[in-house]
A protein has these predicted regions:
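Bacterial N-terminal signal peptides that target proteins for export
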Residues: 1-6
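Terminal accessory carbohydrate-recognition/targeting modules of carbohydrate-active enzymes
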Residues: 22-28, 32, 43, 371-434, ...
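CBM-like, beta-strand-rich accessory domains located in the C-terminal region of large
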Residues: 21, 320-328, 420-599
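Carbohydrate-active enzyme catalytic cores, enriched for enzymes
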Residues: 200, 241-409, 470-475, 479-481, ...
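Aromatic-lined, polymer-binding surfaces characteristic
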Residues: 33, 39-41, 47-48, 54-62, ...
């Protein structure tokens, strides 16, 4: 233990030395210094005049800003243990209004932004017990304070500055747990605090430097999650959240201090943009593993990555979304960032990516094959490994998403709203083997496209690795080692899942039993209608397409159709979906193979 403490102290000292080398506080830019520095408006105006899709985004921000003018001020209303929705509302309003003022110079926007800042500054606190709420609120006030600095009267500046310091910077103890976290909490909380420190730097330089240096010391923990090759352990949904704030953090360092102190160079971070691109299937839906919702949304942070890496192919999908008049945006409260990041980028000749395979290791290994980038009918296979102990994870090792000819045949039900569970007393964050989290239908293994042995939960203290990748024309897929997931009941479990030359799905499970026989339950969640049509066969039908599932196994197989009706009063309904699959008993002390393959159903 003493050696560990000494090592940490040495690392801390070394990091502070590096920080001193990287950061020259004498170079801090004048206000406005966060994201869009003085005169940066002209580049934004040029880009929105050049590209109609960006002009639509600009007009959207102005229209929503006009709507904000007649709405009531944000109030301190808690939702369970969170103030987060209020922080996000304040952030959206202040960011939009400040942008509108800088682009139009119409004082109505600056005045209302000022009133919003004064309103939340008067809150007794910003709910530091759930520090994400503080992180987003500090970000909101820091942008308003910085962007409207010349507009604000000195008395108002003082009120807002004091709120940033007392309810933001001072609320973060040096030993806050999020400083040690490798999750989105690190990026969000560090990001908000960094903005606060940079915004009020002149008035509290010593305090601001401590916040900045603590950020540079602890933020690499969050960046380590992207290694080694860009996969994000928490899935696309929290990539959108955590990475948005990570980008904001880096961009603020660059705009205010002229350096990101090497943060963007951490292994895997920049590569994660390609991970995110592959998370979107040809249908426009996502590979929504872990706590994630589905849908089609433009992610504005991709424009930062494209600019940083000089790779416009990262915008192939995002640019298409922008052309949609009804486009929605991930983390839309940050929408002005899109126009800031698009400045000095030529969006007129974006080409599709040239790659069709993605694979990452790390905490949550993922494999994806995408048949193309130009058609909704391109095939798509996405498979994951990992552990239930990862932040926001489900019991879904070995699960997959499968699309073909425009149909998503195998789906993930996604997350359930946190408040709907917490308000009923469910301890959603207990990830122990008997934790209540796994009693939620959508989060357990029985609601995912994977195996269940003897009707038991997956072992939480397990890790499913991807051991082999197949990239040939007739075998595009992966081998996942599930042995540790079922270590209490099986000697070995390996899943090989791939698409053949016709892009039919083949799932081959190798299962080696121990001293006792084992009941194997094979499940696939689908939005299709299903019927058992014969021995070892199920037919799926959706949108005029039909697909046949055929099973071979060493013993008798019982084909199964399961309803996705809620099993507990706290479970949300799952309309338009069901589960299909089979059950079979495997004898003791034997190596067994269960094979499921798809094919086009014959016409009746």
């Amino acid at each position: 233990r003493l050696q560990r403490i000494i090592l940490l102290l040495v690392l801390a000292f070394y990091s502070l030395v590096l920080c001193a080398q990287f950061v020259d506080y004498e170079r801090i830019t004048p206000h406005p210094r966060l994201l869009l520095t003085q005169g940066g408006e002209e580049a934004v105006k040029k880009s929105i005049a050049t590209f109609p899709s960006l002009l639509k985004v600009h007009k959207r921000i102005l229209e929503e800003s006009d709507e904000i003018l007649i709405q009531q001020m944000a109030e301190r209303v808690m939702e369970g243990k969170r103030l987060l929705s209020v922080s996000r509302l304040a952030l959206k309003r202040i960011f939009y209004l400040s942008y509108a003022y800088r682009m139009t110079k119409e004082e109505k926007y600056a005045y209302r932004a000022t009133q919003e800042m004064l309103s939340v500054s008067r809150f007794p606190d910003w709910n530091p017990s759930h520090f994400l709420d503080v992180g987003e609120m500090v970000l909101a006030l820091s942008i308003g304070y910085d962007w409207l600095y010349e507009y604000l009267e000195s008395e108002i500046r003082s009120i807002v500055r004091d709120a940033i310091v007392e309810k933001g910077l001072d609320a973060a103890a040096p030993d806050e747990w999020f400083y040690r976290a490798a999750s989105n909490w690190n990026s969000v909380c560090n990001g908000g605090l960094l903005y606060g420190a940079l915004a009020v730097f002149e008035d509290v330089p010593d305090k601001a430097k401590k916040i900045i240096e603590r950020c540079l010391l602890t933020n690499p923990k969050a960046l380590s999650a992207y290694g080694p090759d860009g996969g994000y352990p928490e899935g696309f949904h929290y990539w959108g959240y955590g990475t948005s704030f990570q980008v904001l953090l880096i961009a603020a360092l660059e705009s205010a201090l002229g350096t990101d102190a090497g943060l963007s160079e951490y292994p895997g971070f920049l590569k994660s943009a390609r991970f995110m691109e592959f998370m979107t299937a040809p249908s426009g839906e996502y590979f929504n593993f872990s706590d994630a919702v589905n849908g089609v949304r433009c992610n504005m942070m991709m424009f930062w990555f494209a600019k940083k890496m000089g790779d416009l192919s990262l915008l192939w999908l995002e640019n298409q979304y922008l052309e949609n008049p009804s486009v929605s945006f991930a983390e839309d409260r940050l929408l002005p960032c899109l126009l800031i990041f698009c400045a000095h980028q030529d969006l007129s000749n974006i080409q599709p990516p040239s790659c069709h395979f993605w694979h990452n290791g790390g905490k949550t290994p993922v494999f994806i094959y995408r048949g193309g980038w130009n058609s909704k009918e391109d095939s798509y296979l996405a498979v994951k490994g990992g552990s239930p102990l990862t932040s926001h994870a489900h019991m879904d090792a070995g699960s997959f998403i499968y699309e073909r000819e425009g149909i998503r045949w195998a789906i993930d039900l996604g997350m359930q709203n946190y408040l709907s569970l917490e308000s009923r007393g469910i301890n959603l964050w207990d990830q122990s083997q008997e934790g209540q989290r796994w009693g939620v239908f959508r989060l357990g293994n029985m609601a995912h496209n994977t195996l269940t042995i003897n009707n038991k939960r997956h072992l939480v203290n397990s890790y499913a690795s991807i051991n082999r990748i197949y990239k040939s024309e007739d075998k595009k897929g992966v081998e996942v080692d599930l042995t540790s997931v079922f270590a209490d009941d099986m000697e070995k479990v390996v899943r090989i899942i791939y698409l053949n030359e016709e892009d039919d799905l083949i799932v081959k499970d190798e299962l080696v039993t121990g001293e006792k026989e084992a009941l194997v339950t094979w499940i696939m969640v689908t939005p299709a209608e299903a019927r058992i049509v014969g021995r070892n066969q199920i037919e799926l039908a959706k949108d005029g397409h039909r697909m046949l599932l055929t099973v071979t196994a060493p013993g008798d197989v019982e084909m199964k159709l399961w309803s996705n009706e809620p099993t507990h009063v706290f479970d949300e309904p799952n309309p338009g979906s069901m589960r299909v699959g089979f059950e079979t008993y495997l004898p003791a002390n034997r190596r067994n193979f269960c094979l499921l393959y798809t094919s086009d159903a014959a016409d009746e």
